[in-house]
Amino acid sequence: LMGIIMPEEPAGPVVKAADGAARITTFKTLTKDGHNPTLVPAITAGTLFTGVFSINISSTLKSTKFGLPYNKKPSKFSFTYKYTPGSPVYQSVEKDGRNHAVLVDDKDLDQCSIAAYLFEVSSYDETLDGTNVNTSSKVILKAELTDGTAKSDYQEVTVDFKETGNGSYDATKKYKLAIVCTSSKWGDQFMGADLSSLYVKYLAVE
């Protein structure tokens, strides 16, 4: 991949771990000379999600098409996970036509994010993506992990869906549900730590 150095283990951003969990990993992806062409971020957060991945060369964050059709009002989001954050935290910054990994001074450790979103659509062809899933007025319900810090042992968590203030559920309307799990919660800003690893064993919405 354009001379980018990738660690041998783990082998990719989302792989099956030895215990059967999904291992989701952030990479500092740089060429041998320490910077990348502008189309290749210097920091890439691993993301496991419901939806479709379709490469968008002009906007990497729009490659993740979040959401699947969902026909009822969700109440709870349950998951089992553990997390090993990397350090230090870097951000991919463009300079002189290249992307560089720049140290983020005010963040010592990375954090993960696990969240579920119910959003309204006029057509099931509509999706949200990495640029707008956390800001879109279409999202009416959201359930999320509140503590994205290190967890050495698996945690069983159940969180409630809460209204976002963008309207209430209406059974006559169309909705899609997006579950998004990432090893770097600031990944939509191309920010994270090399080899931060989120392990997810179980996901359920009820």
In which residue ranges do the predicted regions lie?
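Short amphipathic, basic-aromatic surface patches that mediate peripheral association
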Residues: 81-105
